[in-house]
Amino acid sequence: MSEKKINLLDLDRKALRALFTEMGEKPFRADQLMKWIYHFGVSDFEEMTNINKVLRAKLAAKCEIVAPEISSYQKSVDGTIKFAINVGDGQEVETVYIPEDDRATLCVSSQVGCALECTFCSTAQQGFNRNLTVAEIVGQIWRVADFIGFVKDTGERPITNVVMMGMGEPLLNLKNVIPAMDIMLDDFGFSLSKRRVTLSTSGVVPALDKLGDVLDVALAVSIHAPNDELRDVLVPVNKKYPLEEFLGGIRRYIAKSNANRGRVTVEYVMLDHINDSTDQAHELAKLMKDTPCKVNLIPFNPYPGSPYGRSSNSRIDRFSKVLMEYGLTVIVRKTRGDDIDAACGQLAGDIRDRTKRLAKKQMQQNQISVTIN
């Protein structure tokens, strides 16, 4: 049985340099290799012309460069593209490319499904199977960049921003998310500014503290409710890490970070007559008074079977004005890709649910149906 080859997309620069040293090669060769992979989109060692022929042969015998394949894609009328990425065993995660005039953002997944159970999120309703590997995380960027088109002669990439806001809770996969983001930030990797890489979390506080100790990227926090009582329902991880504990973790992260320019982005999904009253706006403003932030109001994007509706524009406008009265910077997010279910909260993928969440939900619905009838 042949030895399994090392997928080089799994290795950040430190690990890749260690591999080259182990192979009896100069560590700087790792930098050259990374440039070929991430700047020029090359996966064939024979195309790496500044690496000598003997080393190319050694690499081909021991290593491979394999990103997960694109199974299918859909393009929205607004230019947004949703990709289904095949991660094996018949499972897919979803990745979304969002082009704008001055940037091109890729929304990347970190898990097959999600271990959390936020009640307004389509991904959460699909259950959870496993964490994605480093290669599967950076491979989403690599594969989409290849699809859109690397500029081979300059190394210019078609993706300028990455947001870890796809399927999954990134802080529950720190082992793989940290080296993946290292590759995103590395000058020999995707060479993105730390202000152009954003991690979004629902509030796994110990992991947030650990992230702040080792990496500096922009942070977005999923608040979605102005008090613990409502957040316990909408974002059940709140029962373990309630708002004050989460806000303390956020402030500690901001204190360590340069990428956030002294403040964090608060994400707040607008659910009709659930969390969008003017009283709740006052409550949210008071909650955030000691945490430097800008607030991103996200019109809810319905999915099949969703128990919630989208707040009206007038309710969003009133909510926004209350927050601004407190001096908060408020942005109402422009919905992108909702016609192809690629908008915030709509990603679902194709998942083998190890949590049996879908089965339990179906059983509960059947029991309700029997009771009603």
Curated annotation (Swiss-Prot):
Residues 100-339 form the Radical SAM core domain. Signal peptide: none annotated. It is found in: Cytoplasm. GO terms for cellular component: cytoplasm. Its EC number is 2.1.1.192. CDD domains: Radical_SAM (cd01335). S-adenosyl-L-methionine binds at G168, E169, S200, S222, I223, H224, N301. It comes from the Bacteria. Its cofactor is [4Fe-4S] cluster. Disulfide bonds join C107-C344. Binds 1 [4Fe-4S] cluster. The cluster is coordinated with 3 cysteines and an exchangeable S-adenosyl-L-methionine. Keywords: 4Fe-4S, Cytoplasm, Disulfide bond, Iron, Iron-sulfur, Metal-binding, Methyltransferase, rRNA processing, S-adenosyl-L-methionine, Transferase, tRNA processing. [4Fe-4S] cluster binds at C114, C118, C121. It catalyses: adenosine(2503) in 23S rRNA + 2 reduced [2Fe-2S]-[ferredoxin] + 2 S-adenosyl-L-methionine = 2-methyladenosine(2503) in 23S rRNA + 5'-deoxyadenosine + L-methionine + 2 oxidized [2Fe-2S]-[ferredoxin] + S-adenosyl-L-homocysteine; adenosine(37) in tRNA + 2 reduced [2Fe-2S]-[ferredoxin] + 2 S-adenosyl-L-methionine = 2-methyladenosine(37) in tRNA + 5'-deoxyadenosine + L-methionine + 2 oxidized [2Fe-2S]-[ferredoxin] + S-adenosyl-L-homocysteine. Belongs to the radical SAM superfamily. RlmN family. Specifically methylates position 2 of adenine 2503 in 23S rRNA and position 2 of adenine 37 in tRNAs. m2A2503 modification seems to play a crucial role in the proofreading step occurring at the peptidyl transferase center and thus would serve to optimize ribosomal fidelity. This is Dual-specificity RNA methyltransferase RlmN. It comes from Shewanella pealeana (strain ATCC 700345 / ANG-SQ1). The lineage of its organism: Bacteria, Pseudomonadati, Pseudomonadota, Gammaproteobacteria, Alteromonadales.
